A protein has these predicted regions:
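Helix-to-coil boundary motifs at intracellular loop junctions of multi-pass secondary transporters
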Residues: 34-39, 72-73, 143-148
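The feature captures the transmembrane alpha-helix scaffold of multi-pass secondary transporters
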Residues: 10, 14, 49, 104-105, ...
């Protein structure tokens, strides 16, 4: 006998699912433009390639490892809740990476500060991807599968 999914549960699926997709859109659409805006010169494409490759590697490894961990522990709501909160914080943190701030903090020339900012974006993108893959790819997708009826 199948269990009917309530309107409230559908709303949770939709809202959490959309929030996750918005965060991925920010990463996939805007980080390229953000790095370009730093003025890293002709090395722009190199930084974008590294960003995409590193993020993909982190996403695959995190989804496999943390998905397995959430399967074993069985606390998907915890992984979803904490992961989404940390994912949001890490996404918002991109706004604090500014070339002028790096110049002021470290006394770097403009191009060196721009390249440092690009590296910080790559590192923060990997951190953001870790939280996003944990909460959305590993835990949320499995939670939806577990709580819905395929028949």
């Amino acid at each position: 006998m199948s269990k009917k999914i309530s309107a409230r549960q559908w709303l949770v699926y939709i809202i959490i699912g959309l929030i996750g997709q918005v965060a991925w859109v920010i990463e996939n659409m805007y980080l390229n433009t953000y790095i370009f805006s730093f003025g890293v010169g002709e090395s722009y494409s190199t930084y974008i390639s590294i960003t995409n490759a590193a993020s993909a590697i982190v996403a695959v490894l995190t989804t496999m490892l943390l998905g397995t961990l959430s399967d074993k522990i069985g606390k998907r709501k915890f992984f979803i809740s904490v992961g989404y909160i940390l994912w949001g914080i890490s996404t918002l943190s991109f706004g604090f990476i500014k070339v002028t701030t790096i110049q002021g903090l470290f006394g770097l020339e403009a191009l060196s500060a721009a390249k440092t900012a690009a590296v910080l974006v790559i590192v923060l993108d990997c951190i953001m991807t870790f939280f996003g893959s944990t909460s959305n790819d590993a835990a949320f997708n499995a939670y939806v599968t577990e709580t819905t009826d395929s028949g």
